[in-house]
UniProtKB/Swiss-Prot annotation:
Pfam families: DD_K. Keywords: Amidation, Amphibian defense peptide, Antibiotic, Antimicrobial, Secreted. InterPro entries: Dermaseptin_dom (IPR022731). The lineage of its organism: Eukaryota, Metazoa, Chordata, Craniata, Vertebrata. Has antimicrobial activity. This is Dermaseptin-J6. GO terms for cellular component: extracellular region. It is found in: Secreted. The keyword Secreted applies. Belongs to the frog skin active peptide (FSAP) family. Dermaseptin subfamily.
Length: 29
């Protein structure tokens, strides 16, 4: 349903944000 779609989108956003944060940290080291 709609709720599971929202949860999936949230998970994807968290993953993308985590990857971006890791990339920024790696770049700054």
């Amino acid at each position: 349903g709609l709720w599971s779609k929202i949860k999936e989108a949230g998970k994807a956003a968290v993953k993308a944000a985590g990857k971006a944060a890791l990339g920024a940290v790696a770049d700054s080291v």
